[in-house]
């Protein structure tokens, strides 16, 4: 899962970029950066609107694996490149995720400030179904 404030970068902006994708940069937390490093080309990621909305709004696909973040002067952190895959027909709110006991283990709930986090396959299926894609 990748998190962004929608007033900074939203699923609608991601959609407009199209198939060329964008660089997902600016991650300055080591745990989040390590999660970026684990991603493989073709991996799907939920796109979460943080702070404003607090909801999963869509899905993006990794098109380029971890490389040195061009915005990091010290070259310690990495970025990836993602492209828009699909928008959820119904956004999945943090409130609804918290209500589902099968999702209580997610980093989204346990480590709410983490900007990049894994989602296991079972949880992915539950959330995907909630979004009625």
Q: What is the predicted role of each segment?
A:
Residues 1-5, 65-66, 105, 114, ...:
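Mixed-charge, low-complexity intrinsically disordered regions
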Residues 13, 91-97, 128-130:
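Short, charged, solvent-exposed linker or helix-capping segments at domain edges/interfaces
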Residues 37-39, 55, 60:
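A contiguous binding-surface segment within folded domains or other stable secondary-structure elements
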Residues 4-11, 55-58, 116:
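A cross-family signal for N-terminal binding/gating loops and helix N-caps
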Residues 48-54:
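Short, charged beta-turn/beta-strand-edge "cap" motif at the junction between a beta-strand
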Residues 1-39, 123, 131-133:
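Compositionally biased, charged N-terminal/linker segments
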Residues 58-117:
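Aromatic- and Lys/Arg-enriched surface recognition patch
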């Amino acid at each position: 899962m990748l998190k962004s404030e929608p007033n900074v970068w939203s699923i609608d902006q991601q959609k407009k970029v199209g198939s060329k994708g964008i660089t997902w940069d600016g991650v300055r937390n080591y745990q989040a950066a390590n999660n970026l490093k684990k991603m493989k080309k073709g991996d799907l990621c939920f796109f979460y609107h943080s702070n404003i909305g607090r909801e999963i709004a869509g899905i993006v696909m990794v098109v380029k694996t971890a490389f040195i973040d061009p915005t990091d002067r010290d070259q310690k952190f990495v970025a990836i490149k993602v492209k828009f895959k699909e928008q959820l027909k119904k956004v999945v709110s943090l409130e609804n995720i918290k209500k589902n006991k099968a999702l209580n283990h997610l980093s989204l709930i346990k480590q709410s400030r983490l900007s990049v986090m894994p989602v296991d396959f079972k949880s992915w299926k539950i959330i995907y179904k909630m979004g009625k894609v």
